[in-house]
Amino acid sequence: NLDLRIAYARGFRSPSLRELYFNFFDANHQIIGNPDLKAETSHSFTGSLSWKKISPSEVAYTTIFSGFYNNVTNLIDYAVSANDPNIFILTNVSKSKTAGVSLTSVVKYKNWNVAVGGSYTGFYNVYVEEDKELPQLQWSAEANTNIGYNFSKIGLDANLFYKFTGKKPGYVFDNTTQEYIQSEMKGYHMADFTMNKKLFKHFSLNAGAKNIFNVKSIKNSVIGNSVHASNGISNIAYGRSYFAGLSFNWNKK
């Protein structure tokens, strides 16, 4: 069973009132609105090819290969102030492009549900406007796995999610040499575990752990003269956390 889909979309987004006029201040950073923001416009292309099969032993297979390309004009984004690195100002990026491909496979058998996927995404290099020799897109890989099992006799679902984010390349401008130098953010691993238990007819109990590997920050490095030098860190998460909750779902039939 094959399914091919191709789509095109023309996008338009006006800046929100928050982006135009809202100013936010706290102890760590400041965000400044910009009343001169222009509306975003974009062209988006997507495509996917999916394959499904159910074997005689009732194993269900699904594989999806997809790709996308986005071309955005006047992208609304945050820029660091030249006077203070703790101040972020909303601005328009004249050009921005993203592209990528992904492959996902899902296998379902009885109470098991296993999904494995990967993607390769290219992010626009803003410095290419100043130096045409730089690559237009900077590529980064991701891989993820989700394993779920349903304990049907006791009404319990357990799910383990894992994701690897590969190193993300970039460029920085060296004021000393007046050159663009390649940089990169290191890759990292994330994992979550959740459980859901049905209680009575309308209640369910959920609990689990997020960010099991306790990832908080990732090192950035600058690559120059075949030497990797530390260039600070990027904060990406709050660390490991645990949660538990009780939910109520009422459906009148």
Stretches found by the model and what they are:
Residues T46, A158, F243-A244:
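A general structural signal for well-ordered alpha-helical segments in protein cores
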Residues R5, A9, S48-K52, T104-K108, ...:
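Transmembrane beta-barrel domains of outer membrane proteins
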Residues I6-R10, E19, T63-Y69, V116-Y120, ...:
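Transmembrane beta-barrel strands of outer-membrane/channel proteins
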Residues N1-D3, R10-N71, A82-K108, Q136-S140, ...:
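Outer-membrane beta-barrel signature, preferentially recognizing the C-terminal barrel domain
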